[in-house]
Amino acid sequence: MNPQRKKRLFLILGLLAGVGVAVGFALSALQQNINLFYTPTQIANGEAPLDTRIRAGGMVEKGSVQRSADSLDVRFVVTDYTKSVPITYRGILPDLFREGQGIVALGKLNADGVVVADEVLAKHDEKYMPPEVTKALKESGQAASDAGAKP
């Protein structure tokens, strides 16, 4: 092999190695930013990973909202009408957050089975339901339109 071909070969191999490393870094960064959606049933059954950021969604159980008198801590229970999961949140809840409405909470599941949320998203319209929540309610045998009427 002449020196010019050898030089080209090493250049091409170096470029391929660089592209491979860049793709590896990109995939690693994307994997860390993925927040998978879990229903209360999946969380209660142990399908959700501990100490990993997840999205938990469902309907806020009526009578489950407990607000702390001296801080912004809120504790409530989310259900898909099959199983329920407690969620804690520190901060100001969205204006449209209320019992009997659909929400999606972003946070980490701790060892006690409680989702410690750092963000809570509430539905913004009477007819709107997050797609994940609608799918979970259909799978549990509840129609999305009946969800607000159930206790």
UniProtKB/Swiss-Prot annotation:
GO terms for molecular function: heme binding; metal ion binding. It is found in: Cell inner membrane. Keywords: Cell inner membrane, Cell membrane, Cytochrome c-type biogenesis, Heme, Iron, Membrane, Metal-binding, Signal-anchor, Transmembrane, Transmembrane helix. One of its GO terms (cellular component) is plasma membrane. The chain crosses the membrane at residues 9-29. Residues 1-8 are cytoplasmic. InterPro entries: CcmE, CcmE-like_sf, NA-bd_OB-fold. Heme chaperone required for the biogenesis of c-type cytochromes. Transiently binds heme delivered by CcmC and transfers the heme to apo-cytochromes in a process facilitated by CcmF and CcmH. This is Cytochrome c-type biogenesis protein CcmE. It comes from Pseudomonas entomophila (strain L48). The gene is ccmE.
